[in-house]
């Protein structure tokens, strides 16, 4: 992987978590956001939610493309696996209307099953808000985050939004390793 997808990490965080972003195109305001950078200190056993039909229009996500190709190399002849993976991927990638969080119940139950029953350490799935275009979300078990990740720095940022235009300004970066701003 050429790691091109990493350039979009802040965009994914804002699109998935920002209240301003989720208020719609016409929202205006300012919001403070903290973004953290972690180093993997030990390999993490990740299951990726993908199917043969995942985000067909995505054209700039090399990681997602590689994962789909690996999946198809293993399961392209297995109709049952294709059917189940398509259902699971649809549950993880559907747009949920504000106030209808109950629509996350199936994907939440599946993630819990994968993490706690099958003992995967993390679940990766394409960003819904960006249509899979910019990268993947990663849900990591807390014990794995504590033992296999090391916090490197924390960036305090301000997200300014004026209708359809937005910009993120980094206000400070705290270097955890060297204990300095």
Please describe what each predicted stretch is:
Residues 1-7:
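A short, exposed loop/beta-hairpin motif centered on an aromatic-Gly-Thr core
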Residues 20-181:
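Active-site and NAD+-binding cores of ADP-ribose-processing enzymes
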Residues 10-22:
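Short active-site loop/helix that positions an aromatic residue
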């Amino acid at each position: 992987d050429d790691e091109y997808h990493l350039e979009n990490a802040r965009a994914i965080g804002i699109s998935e978590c920002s209240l301003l972003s989720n208020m719609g195109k016409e929202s205006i305001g300012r919001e403070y956001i903290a973004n953290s950078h972690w180093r993997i200190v030990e390999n993490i056993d990740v299951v990726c939610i993908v199917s043969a039909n995942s985000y067909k229009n995505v054209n700039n996500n090399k990681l997602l493309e590689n994962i789909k190709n690996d999946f198809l190399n293993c399961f392209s002849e297995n109709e049952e696996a294709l059917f189940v993976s398509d259902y699971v991927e649809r549950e993880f990638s559907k747009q949920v209307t504000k106030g209808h969080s109950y629509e996350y119940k199936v994907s939440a139950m599946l993630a819990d099953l994968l993490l706690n029953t099958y003992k995967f350490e993390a679940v990766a799935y394409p960003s819904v808000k960006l249509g899979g275009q910019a990268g993947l979300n990663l849900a990591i078990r807390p014990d794995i985050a504590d033992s296999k990740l090391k916090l490197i720095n924390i960036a305090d940022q301000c997200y300014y939004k004026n209708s359809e235009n937005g910009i993120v300004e980094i206000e400070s970066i705290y270097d955890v390793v060297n204990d300095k701003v």
